[in-house]
Design a protein with these regions (language model features):
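C-terminal peripheral helix-coil segments that are non-catalytic and often amphipathic
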Residues: 1-3, 97-100, 104, 133-149, ...
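Amphipathic alpha-helical linker/stalk segments
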Residues: 2, 65-94, 123-124, 130, ...
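Generic hydrophobic, amphipathic alpha-helix propensity
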Residues: 15-23, 40, 65-69, 73, ...
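Helix-turn-helix
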Residues: 18, 26-60, 64-65
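Short hydrophobic clusters on alpha-helical segments that form packing/core surfaces
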Residues: 19-27, 98, 204
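Short coil/turn segments at alpha/beta junctions that flank glycine-rich nucleotide-binding fingerprints
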Residues: 29-33, 84, 105, 149
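Hydrophobic alpha-helical connector segments
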Residues: 79-110, 131, 158-162, 194-197
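Amphipathic alpha-helical segments used for helix-helix packing
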Residues: 104-125, 176-183
Length: 212
């Protein structure tokens, strides 16, 4: 039988992955409200019914996009804190990894920005998607080790620290276009981003280290 006459076999994993890739790109560019199911299936090159087969509806597909992107960062957070026995190195490394992740995953920055523009309505309905409880728990352990050994000063709140860690890294990527003009630094430049990372590490550690 010639190849042209052979039946085409459906590959569920490939079809699902194509839908996720297309949806991630479109939701990142236009937000949840700016994208239709028709546009997603056209970009993915699959039948429309596949969306409802794998994800039930547009909301289910969007939830899976967020879960897929956010879980990658959660894995990095968990691995970083678990592998860093030295508290100072743990804090330094999570900042390095945040900068790296945000630079490598612009869709994460865009999706989170869109969710904030929507007042987090979707996250309110699916709070487990963006829960930082595991990261807070792991960061608390790092801080406790630092305080017990006298490296960090007492009274550091892990929730506020996590917000600071994320914020310092996030703004270099989320606001790079506007800040590049307003402060006169090219935030697209790898050299400038390295300077920003070094500055963020120094700033955080100077605030955590116990003064002698």
């Amino acid at each position: 039988m010639h190849k042209a006459n052979q039946p085409r076999h459906h590959n569920p994993e490939r079809t699902r992955a194509r839908l996720l890739r297309a949806a991630t790109r479109l939701f990142s560019n236009f937000g949840y409200d700016g994208v239709s199911v028709d546009e997603i299936v056209k970009a993915a090159g699959v039948n429309k019914r596949m969306v409802y087969h794998y994800f039930e509806n547009k909301e289910g597909l969007y939830a899976e996009v967020l879960r897929s992107v956010f879980s990658r960062l959660a894995d990095i957070e968990q691995r970083t804190f678990d592998e860093s026995r030295d508290p100072v190195e743990g804090i330094r490394q999570i900042l390095v990894n945040y900068f790296q992740f945000l630079g490598d995953n612009p869709e994460f920055v865009a999706l989170l920005s869109w969710e904030n523009l929507r007042q987090g309505r979707f996250i309110d309905e699916h709070p487990q998607l963006l829960s930082k409880n595991p990261a807070i728990s792991s960061l608390r352990e790092v801080l406790n080790r630092g305080m017990e050994t006298g490296v960090f000063h007492d009274g550091i709140d892990p929730k506020h620290l996590l917000i600071s860690l994320i914020s310092l890294c996030f703004i270099y990527h989320s606001n790079r276009y506007t800040l590049s003009h307003s402060v006169g630094l090219d935030l697209h430049s790898p050299a400038v981003l390295r300077q920003g990372l070094s500055h963020s590490i120094d700033l955080v550690l100077n605030g955590l280290l116990k003064r002698t």
